[in-house]
Amino acid sequence: MSEGKEVKKPSARELAAFCEKVLDDHKAENIIRFDMEGLEWAQADCYIVCTGISAPHIGALAERVVREVRSEYALRPSAVDGDPQSKWIIADFGNVMIHVLTTEARERYQLEELWNDAPKEDCVRRLDEEHRRHEAEKE
């Protein structure tokens, strides 16, 4: 966070969108956001699930999100559970939970099936469309 910068607390959607961009910028794959708002059993308003290509990559992705959220919004996760060797890391920002998994762990735990009743969005597709629009505006 730069000196003198006013920090506003982001909404769950704003924080989720920021985290999705960070993950995409650092080569996370298959980024999906589940909008959990209004679901009684959900612990957060948004769950983000993404895949890293290796155990070290998921560690780097989780660290990068935590660092950039702290820099941009002065927020720290209430918990970061797991480690690269477990093949699944969760960063809990309260209203947004980020799940970073290896391909093997994502296939094993099938979180998309577990949360099937929640609306979901393919973030990679949306981010690609936003990037294309931004490039077209520059021309």
Regions found by a protein language model. Name each.
Residues V49-T51:
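Short hydrophobic/aromatic beta-strand micro-patches
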Residues V66-R67:
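Anionic-ligand anchoring segments at beta-strand to alpha-helix junctions in alpha/beta enzyme folds, i.e.
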Residues A44-C46:
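Short amphipathic alpha-helical segments
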Residues R70:
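Post-Walker A helix-loop "phosphate-sensing" segment adjacent to the P-loop in P-loop NTPases
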Residues M1-L39, I53-E63, Y73-L75, D81-D83, ...:
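Long, contiguous binding/interaction regions
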